[in-house]
Amino acid sequence: MGIPPYHWWRTVFFLIPALTVYTIVCGAASILSSFFDRNGYFAHGCARAWSWLILKTTGVEVDVIGLDKLTPGTTYVFVANHSSHYDTPVVFTHLPFQVRIIAKQALAMFPVLGWHLKRGGHLFVDRKDPDRTGILKRWRALVSQGLSLIVYPEGTRTVDGHVARFKAGSFLLAIQAGLPIVPLSIVGNRAVMPKGRLRTEPAHVSLIVHDPIQPPVLVEPTVHDAKDLAERVHDIVAAPIEHALDVVHG
Protein backbone atom coordinates (compact mmCIF):
# COMPACT_ATOMS: atom_id res chain seq x y z
CA MET A 1 0.00 0.00 0.00
CA GLY A 2 1.37 3.42 -1.00
CA ILE A 3 1.87 6.27 1.40
CA PRO A 4 -1.20 8.58 1.31
CA PRO A 5 -0.49 12.21 0.36
CA TYR A 6 0.04 14.73 3.13
CA HIS A 7 -2.77 17.29 3.09
CA TRP A 8 -2.39 20.75 4.55
CA TRP A 9 -3.88 19.68 7.89
CA ARG A 10 -1.35 16.86 8.23
CA THR A 11 1.48 19.29 7.56
CA VAL A 12 0.20 21.85 10.05
CA PHE A 13 -0.89 19.55 12.86
CA PHE A 14 1.65 16.72 12.57
CA LEU A 15 4.67 17.52 10.43
CA ILE A 16 5.43 21.05 11.63
CA PRO A 17 5.18 20.10 15.34
CA ALA A 18 7.38 17.04 14.69
CA LEU A 19 10.00 19.09 12.85
CA THR A 20 9.96 21.65 15.63
CA VAL A 21 10.73 18.94 18.19
CA TYR A 22 13.47 17.45 15.99
CA THR A 23 15.06 20.87 15.54
CA ILE A 24 15.00 21.74 19.24
CA VAL A 25 16.33 18.35 20.40
CA CYS A 26 19.00 17.87 17.71
CA GLY A 27 19.90 21.56 17.73
CA ALA A 28 20.33 21.63 21.50
CA ALA A 29 22.50 18.49 21.40
CA SER A 30 24.57 20.02 18.61
CA ILE A 31 25.08 23.33 20.42
CA LEU A 32 26.01 21.65 23.70
CA SER A 33 28.47 19.33 21.95
CA SER A 34 30.27 22.32 20.40
CA PHE A 35 31.73 23.20 23.80
CA PHE A 36 33.82 20.01 23.87
CA ASP A 37 33.89 19.01 20.18
CA ARG A 38 35.61 21.93 18.45
CA ASN A 39 35.75 20.20 15.06
CA GLY A 40 31.97 19.86 14.96
CA TYR A 41 31.96 16.13 14.19
CA PHE A 42 29.24 15.34 16.73
CA ALA A 43 27.26 18.38 15.58
CA HIS A 44 27.34 16.99 12.05
CA GLY A 45 26.03 13.69 13.40
CA CYS A 46 23.14 15.62 14.96
CA ALA A 47 22.49 17.31 11.61
CA ARG A 48 22.42 13.94 9.84
CA ALA A 49 20.01 12.54 12.43
CA TRP A 50 17.80 15.63 12.06
CA SER A 51 17.86 15.26 8.28
CA TRP A 52 17.03 11.53 8.40
CA LEU A 53 14.09 12.15 10.73
CA ILE A 54 12.73 14.89 8.47
CA LEU A 55 12.88 12.69 5.37
CA LYS A 56 11.28 9.70 7.11
CA THR A 57 8.52 11.78 8.71
CA THR A 58 7.69 13.48 5.42
CA GLY A 59 7.78 10.25 3.42
CA VAL A 60 10.72 11.07 1.14
CA GLU A 61 12.48 8.07 -0.40
CA VAL A 62 15.91 8.70 -1.90
CA ASP A 63 17.86 6.72 -4.48
CA VAL A 64 21.58 7.53 -4.47
CA ILE A 65 23.38 7.01 -7.77
CA GLY A 66 27.15 7.23 -8.27
CA LEU A 67 28.36 7.28 -4.67
CA ASP A 68 31.10 4.83 -5.66
CA LYS A 69 32.76 7.65 -7.64
CA LEU A 70 33.89 9.28 -4.40
CA THR A 71 37.02 8.37 -2.44
CA PRO A 72 36.55 8.10 1.35
CA GLY A 73 38.67 10.58 3.27
CA THR A 74 38.98 13.01 0.36
CA THR A 75 37.93 16.63 0.79
CA TYR A 76 35.44 17.78 -1.86
CA VAL A 77 33.36 20.78 -2.83
CA PHE A 78 29.87 19.41 -3.49
CA VAL A 79 27.86 21.61 -5.86
CA ALA A 80 24.10 21.01 -6.02
CA ASN A 81 20.96 22.52 -7.50
CA HIS A 82 18.51 24.12 -5.07
CA SER A 83 14.75 23.76 -5.56
CA SER A 84 13.44 22.89 -2.09
CA HIS A 85 14.05 23.27 1.64
CA TYR A 86 14.54 19.47 1.54
CA ASP A 87 17.74 19.62 -0.52
CA THR A 88 20.04 19.87 2.51
CA PRO A 89 18.37 16.98 4.40
CA VAL A 90 18.78 14.79 1.30
CA VAL A 91 22.47 15.66 0.94
CA PHE A 92 23.30 15.45 4.65
CA THR A 93 21.59 12.08 5.07
CA HIS A 94 23.15 10.35 2.09
CA LEU A 95 26.69 11.73 1.75
CA PRO A 96 29.03 9.79 4.10
CA PHE A 97 31.35 12.77 4.54
CA GLN A 98 31.89 15.41 7.18
CA VAL A 99 30.39 18.37 5.33
CA ARG A 100 29.75 22.04 6.05
CA ILE A 101 27.57 24.39 4.05
CA ILE A 102 28.08 27.90 2.74
CA ALA A 103 24.84 29.61 3.81
CA LYS A 104 23.37 33.05 3.36
CA GLN A 105 23.93 35.39 6.31
CA ALA A 106 20.19 35.60 7.06
CA LEU A 107 20.17 32.00 8.35
CA ALA A 108 22.47 33.03 11.20
CA MET A 109 19.55 34.95 12.71
CA PHE A 110 17.28 31.88 13.05
CA PRO A 111 16.94 30.55 16.63
CA VAL A 112 18.45 27.06 17.14
CA LEU A 113 19.22 26.55 13.43
CA GLY A 114 21.43 29.63 13.23
CA TRP A 115 23.13 28.77 16.51
CA HIS A 116 23.80 25.21 15.29
CA LEU A 117 25.28 26.47 12.02
CA LYS A 118 27.53 28.96 13.80
CA ARG A 119 28.76 26.54 16.45
CA GLY A 120 29.09 23.69 13.93
CA GLY A 121 31.62 25.52 11.77
CA HIS A 122 29.44 26.37 8.77
CA LEU A 123 30.26 29.43 6.68
CA PHE A 124 28.02 32.45 6.17
CA VAL A 125 28.10 34.81 3.20
CA ASP A 126 26.59 38.27 3.04
CA ARG A 127 25.45 38.56 -0.58
CA LYS A 128 25.52 42.34 -0.44
CA ASP A 129 29.10 42.47 0.85
CA PRO A 130 30.89 39.14 0.29
CA ASP A 131 34.27 39.00 2.01
CA ARG A 132 35.94 36.49 -0.31
CA THR A 133 39.34 36.79 1.36
CA GLY A 134 37.86 36.04 4.78
CA ILE A 135 35.72 33.21 3.40
CA LEU A 136 38.72 31.63 1.67
CA LYS A 137 40.71 31.80 4.91
CA ARG A 138 37.91 30.08 6.85
CA TRP A 139 37.40 27.62 4.00
CA ARG A 140 41.07 26.58 4.12
CA ALA A 141 40.80 26.19 7.90
CA LEU A 142 37.95 23.71 7.37
CA VAL A 143 39.86 21.89 4.64
CA SER A 144 42.83 21.48 6.99
CA GLN A 145 40.46 19.50 9.23
CA GLY A 146 39.42 17.24 6.34
CA LEU A 147 35.98 18.81 6.02
CA SER A 148 34.11 19.00 2.72
CA LEU A 149 31.76 21.80 1.66
CA ILE A 150 28.29 21.97 0.11
CA VAL A 151 27.48 24.90 -2.16
CA TYR A 152 24.20 25.93 -3.81
CA PRO A 153 25.54 28.34 -6.45
CA GLU A 154 22.11 29.40 -7.72
CA GLY A 155 21.95 31.48 -4.55
CA THR A 156 18.32 30.69 -3.75
CA ARG A 157 15.64 28.08 -4.41
CA THR A 158 14.26 28.09 -7.94
CA VAL A 159 10.52 28.50 -8.51
CA ASP A 160 10.00 26.39 -11.64
CA GLY A 161 12.41 23.51 -10.93
CA HIS A 162 14.81 24.43 -13.73
CA VAL A 163 18.44 24.96 -12.76
CA ALA A 164 19.24 28.68 -12.73
CA ARG A 165 22.57 30.19 -13.68
CA PHE A 166 25.40 29.36 -11.27
CA LYS A 167 27.12 32.31 -9.63
CA ALA A 168 30.87 32.31 -10.07
CA GLY A 169 31.98 33.27 -6.54
CA SER A 170 32.14 29.80 -5.01
CA PHE A 171 33.93 28.44 -8.08
CA LEU A 172 36.61 31.11 -7.80
CA LEU A 173 37.12 30.02 -4.20
CA ALA A 174 37.27 26.36 -5.26
CA ILE A 175 39.95 27.13 -7.86
CA GLN A 176 41.96 29.11 -5.31
CA ALA A 177 41.68 26.29 -2.78
CA GLY A 178 42.53 23.64 -5.39
CA LEU A 179 39.74 21.30 -4.29
CA PRO A 180 37.96 18.75 -6.52
CA ILE A 181 34.36 19.70 -7.33
CA VAL A 182 31.61 17.09 -7.28
CA PRO A 183 28.43 18.04 -9.17
CA LEU A 184 25.24 16.76 -7.50
CA SER A 185 21.85 16.55 -9.21
CA ILE A 186 18.89 16.41 -6.83
CA VAL A 187 15.99 15.21 -8.98
CA GLY A 188 12.35 15.30 -7.84
CA ASN A 189 12.83 17.19 -4.57
CA ARG A 190 10.71 20.13 -5.70
CA ALA A 191 7.65 17.86 -5.52
CA VAL A 192 8.12 17.54 -1.75
CA MET A 193 7.95 21.25 -0.97
CA PRO A 194 8.42 23.76 -3.78
CA LYS A 195 9.25 27.37 -3.09
CA GLY A 196 6.19 29.30 -1.91
CA ARG A 197 4.21 26.27 -0.65
CA LEU A 198 3.91 25.24 2.99
CA ARG A 199 2.25 21.86 2.43
CA THR A 200 4.54 18.88 1.85
CA GLU A 201 4.03 15.69 -0.16
CA PRO A 202 5.79 12.32 -0.05
CA ALA A 203 8.04 11.87 -3.07
CA HIS A 204 10.67 9.69 -4.67
CA VAL A 205 13.92 11.62 -5.06
CA SER A 206 17.18 10.79 -6.83
CA LEU A 207 20.56 12.08 -5.68
CA ILE A 208 22.96 11.71 -8.59
CA VAL A 209 26.68 11.97 -7.81
CA HIS A 210 28.70 12.90 -10.91
CA ASP A 211 32.40 12.40 -11.55
CA PRO A 212 34.66 14.73 -9.53
CA ILE A 213 36.17 17.61 -11.49
CA GLN A 214 39.64 18.87 -10.67
CA PRO A 215 39.70 22.65 -11.21
CA PRO A 216 42.52 24.14 -13.29
CA VAL A 217 45.75 25.01 -11.50
CA LEU A 218 46.09 28.77 -11.93
CA VAL A 219 48.45 31.18 -10.17
CA GLU A 220 45.96 34.05 -10.32
CA PRO A 221 42.50 32.74 -11.30
CA THR A 222 40.09 35.32 -12.67
CA VAL A 223 36.32 35.71 -12.56
CA HIS A 224 36.30 34.60 -16.21
CA ASP A 225 37.99 31.32 -15.21
CA ALA A 226 35.39 30.84 -12.47
CA LYS A 227 32.52 31.53 -14.87
CA ASP A 228 33.83 28.95 -17.34
CA LEU A 229 33.99 26.34 -14.58
CA ALA A 230 30.56 27.35 -13.27
CA GLU A 231 29.00 26.87 -16.71
CA ARG A 232 30.63 23.46 -17.10
CA VAL A 233 29.38 22.25 -13.71
CA HIS A 234 25.94 23.80 -14.31
CA ASP A 235 25.45 21.80 -17.50
CA ILE A 236 26.39 18.56 -15.73
CA VAL A 237 24.03 19.22 -12.80
CA ALA A 238 21.18 20.39 -15.02
CA ALA A 239 21.16 17.54 -17.57
CA PRO A 240 19.26 14.87 -15.55
CA ILE A 241 16.96 17.49 -14.01
CA GLU A 242 15.96 18.93 -17.38
CA HIS A 243 15.45 15.39 -18.69
CA ALA A 244 13.13 14.60 -15.77
CA LEU A 245 11.16 17.81 -16.37
CA ASP A 246 10.80 16.94 -20.06
CA VAL A 247 9.42 13.51 -19.13
CA VAL A 248 6.92 15.01 -16.66
CA HIS A 249 5.67 17.65 -19.08
CA GLY A 250 5.61 15.27 -22.01
Set out the residue ranges of the language-model regions.
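Membrane-interfacial terminal anchoring regions of lipid-handling membrane enzymes
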Residues: 1-35, 41, 45, 68-71, ...
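Non-catalytic C-terminal accessory region of glycerolipid acyltransferases
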Residues: 2, 134-250
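Catalytic core of membrane glycerolipid acyltransferases/transacylases, capturing the structured
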Residues: 26-44, 48, 55-58, 72-129
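Short gly/ser/thr-rich secondary-structure transition/capping motifs
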Residues: 58-65, 132-133, 189-192
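Structural motif corresponding to alpha-helix initiation and N-cap regions
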Residues: 64-67, 73, 110, 133-136
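A secondary-structure boundary/capping signal
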Residues: 66, 80-82, 103-104, 152-154, ...
